[in-house]
């Protein structure tokens, strides 16, 4: 917590830090306050940096108040303490559940009311289709205590709104995969690869360029994918939505792997450049990844999401783009992805974000 956030005079700040800590931490905070009396006597916020209470006491207090820490997260605040971050991530991993197989008619209230019988529900969310507003058939529940998750898992079958649902423990990824790939839409098929490389090479070293081909005409399509060596060029490029490449005004979007896309979807996105491409905060504050392949590779399986063109390289299928990503302008052919003219790199399944 920064000095400005801590606020108040030094003595009050030290006392506040001491409240949330253990006896040892309280004593440490008081000693620190006494040693910093000169600083505490001033009107500045610097007196609130008592080491004994800030790190230990604040971590315990905020860790115990789930809803408070989540609100801070929603508002974009972050705690720079690695100890705080690791503890909060570990606790959320124990408190959070993925709920699959939901009825299309199930509401957030239904979800919360059902799982409240297992313990205090701090928050819950349903994942909705951004175009239709319809439920995707799955969501997440955050409990106040990990014991509630155990109770849910101990029950063999769960039914909600007349349908058997599929609750699972949520799993947190330890690292965030950097985004190094972009989608370039509205590109003239006649634009030479050299011209594309020259323009985007001005932002950073280009690792590979994918030039998709129509599998019927064997001609290039009006878009491409570019992978950079580092993540920084993507951040620079995403500062503008449109770029002039050759004679074309191109729309740029972040291309994300399946795993990256899953991370972004868990509990929404906050902060980071990827989300700005969608017009809201992006970049996962908690990198949640369920690892439940049946909800992804089969288009969310029984959740009826095949129509969105989600699986494998079909993520580039333009049936999916038209109905979900709104890329109709780049979809003159409705025939999946076809051949890809590619220079360097390896093939992977990506999605524009």
Curated annotation (Swiss-Prot):
Tree of life domain: Eukaryota
Residue list for modification Phosphothreonine: 89, 125, 191
PTM sites of type N-acetylserine: 2
Cross-link annotation Glycyl lysine isopeptide (Lys-Gly) (interchain with G-Cter in SUMO2), location: 70, 127, 195
Region: Disordered, residue numbers: 1-89
Comp. bias regions, Low complexity: 11-42
Keywords carried by this UniProt record: Acetylation, Biological rhythms, Cytoplasm, Isopeptide bond, Methylation, Nucleus, Phosphoprotein, Repeat, Ribonucleoprotein, RNA-binding, Ubl conjugation
GO cellular component: chromatin; cytosol; glutamatergic synapse; mCRD-mediated mRNA stability complex; nucleoplasm; postsynaptic density; ribonucleoprotein complex; synapse
RRM domain ranges (all copies): 95-177, 180-259
PTM description: Methylated by PRMT1, in an insulin-dependent manner. The PRMT1-mediated methylation regulates its phosphorylation. Arg-343 is dimethylated, probably to asymmetric dimethylarginine.
MF annotations from Gene Ontology: chromatin binding; histone deacetylase binding; minor groove of adenine-thymine-rich DNA binding; mRNA 3'-UTR AU-rich region binding; mRNA binding; RNA binding; telomeric DNA binding
A Pfam family per the record: RRM_1
Omega-N-methylarginine: residues carrying this PTM: 270, 276, 278, 280, 343
Positions where Asymmetric dimethylarginine occurs in the chain: 343
Sites bearing Phosphoserine, chain numbering: 69, 78, 80-81, 188, 269
Annotated Basic and acidic residues bias: 62-71
Compositionally skewed regions (Gly residues) per UniProt: 43-56
Keyword Ribonucleoprotein recorded: yes
CDD domains the record matches: RRM1_hnRNPD (cd12756), RRM2_hnRNPD (cd12583)
Biological process annotations from GO: 3'-UTR-mediated mRNA destabilization; cellular response to amino acid stimulus; cellular response to estradiol stimulus; cellular response to nitric oxide; cellular response to putrescine; cerebellum development; circadian regulation of translation; CRD-mediated mRNA stabilization
First-listed, main subcellular location of the protein, grouped into a coarse class: nucleus
Subunit structure: Identified in a IGF2BP1-dependent mRNP granule complex containing untranslated mRNAs. Part of a complex associated with the FOS mCRD domain and consisting of PABPC1, PAIP1, CSDE1/UNR and SYNCRIP. Interacts with IGF2BP2. Interacts with GTPBP1. Interacts with EIF4G1; the interaction requires RNA. Interacts with EIF3B and RPS3.
Function description: Binds with high affinity to RNA molecules that contain AU-rich elements (AREs) found within the 3'-UTR of many proto-oncogenes and cytokine mRNAs. Also binds to double- and single-stranded DNA sequences in a specific manner and functions a transcription factor. Each of the RNA-binding domains specifically can bind solely to a single-stranded non-monotonous 5'-UUAG-3' sequence and also weaker to the single-stranded 5'-TTAGGG-3' telomeric DNA repeat. Binds RNA oligonucleotides with 5'-UUAGGG-3' repeats more tightly than the telomeric single-stranded DNA 5'-TTAGGG-3' repeats.
UniProt protein name: Heterogeneous nuclear ribonucleoprotein D0
Source organism (scientific name): Rattus norvegicus (Rat)
